[in-house]
Amino acid sequence: MSARGDELTTGIHFDMNNKKRPEDLRSHRWLGASDLRSFGHRARLRQGGFNAEDWTGKPVIGVINTWSDINFCHTHLRARAEDVKRGVLQAGGFPVELPAMSLSEPFVKPSTMLYRNLLAMEAEELLRSHPIDGAVLLGGCDKTTPALIMGAISMGVPAIYVPAGPQLNGNWRGQEMGSGSDAWKYWDEKRAGRISEEDWAELEGGIARSFGTCMVMGTAATMMAIAEAVGLSLPGASSIPAADSAHPRMCSASGRRIVDMVWEDLTPQKIMTPAAFDNAIRVHMAMGGSTNAIIHVVAMARRLGLPFDMKRFDEISREIPVLANVRPSGGYLMEDFYYAGGLRALMNELKETLDLTCLTVTGKTIGENIAGAQVYKPDVIHPLSDPVSREGATAVLTGNLAPRGCVMKPSAAEKRLLKHRGKVIAFEDYNEMAREVERDDLDVTADHILVLKNGGPKGGPGMPEWGMLPIPKKLVKQGVRDMVRISDARMSGTSYGACILHVAPESYVGGPLAFVQTGDEIEVDVEARRIHLHVSDEELARRRAAWQQPAPRYPRGYGAIYSMHIGQADEGCDFDFLEGTTPIAEPEIH
């Protein structure tokens, strides 16, 4: 798409032959009958200042908004919801805004991943319990995207996803800064004594300059791109910076389009096919996307009943190199990516590898949506013939340490560490690790492998982003900036380094990671997709017999429900009672 975003409103077609009738609308059950209950519903709408012509015979569109005062990735979504509603009204729909939980990555503790499924449940039940015919999903910050989509899948009404968009580029003393990625970088410089407290305080004011999501290829940017690539957003939507005037135009176009989608009954089930997921994974690899995407994509696919696992990511990773020269795998930022042509241009570079027949929310195919898209800055978006990195964005390793797999981002690691054998320094929990890495007398070299336990879905709990373990301060002062680190936790998509993550099964449930001890040796071979703990089966059995599971963190409340029902990383970390396609009856109206 162009930098102006005008293509978002053009070329969208709608087949009148398949149009629903007003009496077929889901909302008609609430509003269309002549009984006492429908009388009450209509009376309450009039209480809100509406007249019958505002809603009669029109699709009711639920605008699910994850705006919050403490989620600055979504600061603008209060205004953008009005843009969406403007579009809905223009197209002959009746918009109603429904606020939902806002998962602010910086502020929600211990981890937003603890609450992804809660938001998914909220989104599904908001849509089910209200007279909603179609949904516009406003999200962006990391877990909001998969959560909203998972909820919409399970509900099954037509839905379109509106991405919050990335921040403007950060800037400090004339250097462009990326939130997250450069924070980690300069934190190590501060720990090494190479920048002052004054420098650090000044950087704090320049690394995040506007509303919007992290402007590197973190989890937010990755998941917004995946939503577009799988067909749930308008073409080019995921690349638009949050502060750009093209963004409200995209929002109103999404509002217009969802009305037609309701008449067409164009649901996520008709869009999110196995081929569409393959397209999304190919885009993820070419973008150098976040490792977190594996968990979210698997969870979304399982909501649809699709047999999908981490192995498919690895198969595609071996085929698709990194084309987006965006941090942390490259040098540029998301604003640069937008002006270079954005996701449509990158997908057009990938078109020989994509299934161009996949349907999207436009009612057109992916092939039609990306036709003619150009790359304007070839150093930002590379061709397949000259990639940024031939190492895939994500590698899935297996072995006796991770029988069900673990993941790594080879494109963001020092190449010398992609094949490595070293002695282990093991930490039982995050607090122990945080203390030990700051010790100047820690017995550690750059060849050691740091192992963190109890950071998984149950052990964290919520699988916090602890996986980019800090380089020990002693080594940072020596100039070391990467080493092999292994955990059952996740890491921020803005992070980088030779971090092996999502070890499954996790240590808390008795996975092999629980039995690793300081002094053991681990061997990693990314090319061979192998990870091996050099400890005999007999010794591992002895350690297993002596092992005791840590006490549960939550004796009651949502945390207890989470701990009882959460799946492992390779399963998408969904609740066992949310997966699958078993239909739920429509609510009775009394």
Question: What spans do the regions from the language model cover?
Answer:
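N-terminal amphipathic/basic-hydrophobic helices that include classical n-h-c signal peptides
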Residues: M1-D15
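A short, small-residue-rich loop immediately preceding and capping a beta-strand
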Residues: R128-L148, A159-A164
